[in-house]
Amino acid sequence: MAAKKSSTPNRGFKVADQIQRDLTELIRELKDPRIGMVTLQAVEVTPDYAHAKVFFSVLVGDADATQDALNQAAGFLRNGLFKRLHIHTVPTLHFMFDRTTERASDMNALIARAVASRSKDDDEA
C-alpha cells in the first residue's frame, strides 16, 4: 500500500517558517540577561511535528550561555507558540548555536590569505 501523501505540499516548511517568526517575537519578550542579541537562522521541524531544531546566532554575548538560557526557556516559548499556532502538535524546541557565520568568516580569511600569497608569488616572478 502506498504511503499517504500530505494534503498540503511543503506544509513542514510553512510551519517551520511560522515558528521562526513567532519565536523571534517571543524571544524578544524574554527578560533573561543571558539572552542578548539573538538572530534565528533556521528552524527544522520533524515530519510528525514532535521536535524542532532552532538554529540561532549571537551578535553580542556568550553563545553557550545563550544556548543554555534558550533551552531552559524552551517550555515557556513552546507554550507561547501553542497560543499562536493553530496546529495540533507544537514541537519540543531544541536550540542549537549556528556556526555558519564563523565558518564563512574563516573561509573568507583563508581565501584572502591565498590571494595575497598568490599575488606575492606573482610579484616575485
Swiss-Prot record:
GO biological process: maturation of SSU-rRNA
GO MF annotation list: ribosomal small subunit binding
Subcellular location, principal: cytoplasm
Signal peptide: none
Superkingdom: Bacteria
The entry's keywords: Cytoplasm, Ribosome biogenesis
Stored InterPro entries: KH_dom-like_a/b (IPR015946), RbfA (IPR000238), RbfA_dom_sf (IPR023799)
GO cellular component: cytosol
Pfam families named in the record: RBFA (PF02033)
Quaternary context: Monomer. Binds 30S ribosomal subunits, but not 50S ribosomal subunits or 70S ribosomes.
Role this protein plays: One of several proteins that assist in the late maturation steps of the functional core of the 30S ribosomal subunit. Associates with free 30S ribosomal subunits (but not with 30S subunits that are part of 70S ribosomes or polysomes). Required for efficient processing of 16S rRNA. May interact with the 5'-terminal helix region of 16S rRNA.
Protein name per UniProt: Ribosome-binding factor A
Organism: Paracidovorax citrulli (strain AAC00-1)
Gene that encodes the chain: rbfA
